[in-house]
């Protein structure tokens, strides 16, 4: 996803205005199906293996999300989309395919970020946040 696509998607979702302040956000990422493919993709980007339990959970998920937080959600999403300034390991390994949502009412805290990740995770959805898989 490019910065132009990310901007357009925020606008399509009707959350562009709300993204210009602090809060949490979720990005949809592309994760291969199959534990070996997940591990190979991770190792191609990150010079350390992914825990097997994480690889198994990611491979089995229908949807994989990355949840983050920022003092300015829009700027952080643009940084992730650009890939030159900020590139979280999970996003470096598995590319961003869509914006799942933004929550400007969430506090810009680690607790709010983890709570958002927990609320989005389910039997079919894996959520990566700050090095943890929910």
What residue spans do the PLM features occupy?
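A cross-kingdom feature marking charged/low-complexity
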Residues: 104-122
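Basic nucleic-acid-binding interfaces
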Residues: 85, 89-108
């Amino acid at each position: 996803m490019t910065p132009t696509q990310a901007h357009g998607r925020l606008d399509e979702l009707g959350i562009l205005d709300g993204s210009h302040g602090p809060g949490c956000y979720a990005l949809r990422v592309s994760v291969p199906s199959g534990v070996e493919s997940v591990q190979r993709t991770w190792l191609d980007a990150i010079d350390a293996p992914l825990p097997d339990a994480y690889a198994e959970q990611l491979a089995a998920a229908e949807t994989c999300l990355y949840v983050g937080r920022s003092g300015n959600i829009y700027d952080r999403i643009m940084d992730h989309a650009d890939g030159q300034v900020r590139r979280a390991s999970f996003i470096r390994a598995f590319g961003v395919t869509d914006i799942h949502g933004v929550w400007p009412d969430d506090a810009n805290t680690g607790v709010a970020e983890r709570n958002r990740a927990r609320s989005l995770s389910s039997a079919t959805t894996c959520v990566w946040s700050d090095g943890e898989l929910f």
